[in-house]
Amino acid sequence: VPVISVPQAFNEDDLYVDLASIFDVPLYLKCEGFNFAGSIKLKAATEMVEAAERDGVLTRDSVLIESSSGNLGVALAMIAASRGYRFLCVTDSRCNLSTRRLMEALGSQVHIITEADPVGGFLGARIDYVEAMCASDSRFVWLNQYRNPGNWRAHLKRTAPAIARDFPGLDVLFVGAGTTGTLMGCARFFREWHRPVHVVAVDAVGSVTFGGPQARRMIPGLGSGVRPALLDESYIDEVVLVEEADTLRACHRLAHRGFLFGGSTGTVVSGAKSWLDRHGSPGITAVAIAPDLGERYLDTVYQTNWLEDLFGKDVLDPVQAAHPFSESLSRPTDAGADPGRGTLVTSRPDADVVPLPLPRSGN
């Protein structure tokens, strides 16, 4: 019987979902969200914290600080609670409310950036804030997931070898690009593997990672407003860009079959399907990495008002048409109707963002 004493010791990462019956393409989805942090970011967080401890950078007086759109923040909040560190996560207004509350429940503080940098976007503004905090107080320790080699080494040592073991005949691997830690770790591993693997990076339209123009992005996770320092394009064979509307459709298509995945996973799956529709063959062996699960996206990706306000009422039409209950339930028209009279009732979450108090030097 497995017994653990720290939360990061549990990580079920050898589960795959066969998506052939859902998307009509030969694709296996590697699920990375079955741990107490809920995402693949647990691996990078653990690697970076342990390296900082070995190097003597982290001490009992240290205060961890990191810029995160959500998932790494949760992983660091969990590890900080387990190891007795204080942690300040610097995120922005796109971060899901449930994610912010989860970090707070784990004892961490959250600062929300509400104004994007004109050039670097929200990420640039978050990094500026982190740098200012570090300059103001020497107790702050910034692991810097955007430059820390521990980010990609975690996947060189764990994620990629696991895929190679489970799929010795792998032909193509689809990996989402955020900080590019997962992407670079896997790409470096398979560059040295015994057979060629076509590594496809999946990014969001509006991200500048691969040189595209910056544009509005509302789903946290993949994509970046600043080119990641870890990225080395020489290891990558191809890049697929995904519109956020297609991310939403992929998420809902999976949900209609009982699989609730996060926005990053929806982007990767949509990109993989697009590529396989064009290049796939019946004998191809393809794997995509699912970074996260969907519970933290219930107020955004899976919330009707949020979807329609940002992407229009018809964004999910192709998905709804394919759903067996698409015509069975009428859409609610009166949010205040009496639920006892058979009318569906919906509620709209509060969209106000209230920054939390910040730690001050000497406190």
Question: Each predicted region: which residue ranges?
Answer:
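PLP-dependent amino-acid enzyme catalytic core
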Residues: V1-N363
